[in-house]
């Protein structure tokens, strides 16, 4: 009997310690989400927004599908995240450069008017902010 009581106490302590470890990880990710949210509001640079979006998506991927999550809301967010990933390819933290056709793309890009380039960057920023805002709402509200 004495052994069973000691064993249950040890198991209870181990259970509490593992629970606190997960809570700390969630707390660290929660703090990181808040930092990224502030950076997202402060910056209008397309590359910065894409980096923020991919980091936020990484945190979302880590916690999605956990017990007690809103399945309908999560399905809509998954659709939005997958659409964003499909349209915005990032390699090693920077937007994809085009590989072997880089020179041809560069020549074409040089001929594109500056206002079109600016509009394209604005659209990229808006899409990245939209995805990050949806994930912020999912976690922070």
Swiss-Prot record:
InterPro entries: Turandot. It is found in: Secreted. Residues 1-23 form the signal peptide. The keyword Isomerase does not apply. It comes from the Eukaryota. Keywords: Immunity, Innate immunity, Secreted, Signal. One of its GO terms (cellular component) is extracellular space. GO terms for biological process: cellular response to heat; cellular response to oxidative stress; cellular response to UV; innate immune response; response to bacterium; response to heat; response to oxidative stress; response to UV. Belongs to the Turandot family. A humoral factor that may play a role in stress tolerance. This is Protein Turandot Z. It comes from Drosophila yakuba (Fruit fly). The lineage of its organism: Eukaryota, Metazoa, Ecdysozoa, Arthropoda, Hexapoda.
